Swiss-Prot record:
GO molecular function: DNA binding; pyrimidine-specific mismatch base pair DNA N-glycosylase activity; uracil DNA N-glycosylase activity
Family (UniProt): Belongs to the uracil-DNA glycosylase (UDG) superfamily. TDG/mug family.
Subcellular location: Cytoplasm
Location (main, coarse): cytoplasm
GO terms (BP aspect): base-excision repair, AP site formation
Cytoplasm listed as a keyword: yes
Cited CDD domains: UDG-F2_TDG_MUG
Biological role stated in the UniProt entry: Excises ethenocytosine and uracil, which can arise by alkylation or deamination of cytosine, respectively, from the corresponding mispairs with guanine in ds-DNA. It is capable of hydrolyzing the carbon-nitrogen bond between the sugar-phosphate backbone of the DNA and the mispaired base. The complementary strand guanine functions in substrate recognition. Required for DNA damage lesion repair in stationary-phase cells.
Keyword Transport among UniProt keywords: no
Enzyme class: hydrolase
Gene source species: Escherichia coli O157:H7
Official protein name in the record: G/U mismatch-specific DNA glycosylase
Gene: mug
Length: 168
């Protein structure tokens, strides 16, 4: 089981779709060696060095958190049903209402659209929010994603810089 890493007052909560088998096996988020999450958040400016999956709790030192839409681990995210994503979206809203981070970063357009019953999502900040929490849609850093490392870092850096501008 991969536990959420959440606390009140975070700058951002990164929300993956669901744990992969590597994460489920280790108990650490984004644990597969091909997953670029840890490299991307470092290069985008969220951390001052590249954390390892087993150091995930240190995200809180940077006022960052991690959660997921669906708890069930799978090999690929496309094994998750629309119903599971929609139910996960409802639970995610409750978590975000409880913790009230400055931003929620959903990692993947399909996850956002199905989890929040939205259509035609674009990358970046969304018009939808949860209270005062901004919702952002960022490319998924999975090794299965075709998005280049450069584009991932650019998208994540945009969020980091927007939070700095807000004084957070």
């Amino acid at each position: 089981m991969v536990e959420d890493i959440l606390a009140p007052g975070l700058r951002v909560v990164f929300c993956g779709i669901n744990p992969g088998l590597s994460s489920a096996g280790t108990g650490f988020p984004f644990a597969h060696p091909a997953n670029r999450f840890w490299k991307v958040i470092y290069q985008a400016g969220f951390t001052d060095h590249q954390l390892k999956p087993q150091e995930a709790q240190h995200l809180l030192d940077y006022r960052c958190g991690v959660t997921k839409l669906v708890d069930r681990p799978t090999v690929q995210a496309n094994e998750i049903s629309k119903q599971e994503l929609h139910a996960g979206g409802r639970k995610l809203i409750e978590k975000i209402e409880d913790y009230q981070p400055q931003a929620l970063a959903i990692l993947g357009k399909q996850a956002y659209e199905q989890g929040f019953s939205q259509r035609g999502a674009q990358w970046g900040k969304q018009t939808l929010s949860i209270g005062s929490t901004q919702i952002w849609v960022l490319p998924n850093p999975s090794g299965l994603s075709r998005v280049s490392l450069e584009k991932l870092v650019e998208a994540y850096r945009e969020l980091d810089q927007a939070l700095v501008v807000r004084g957070r």
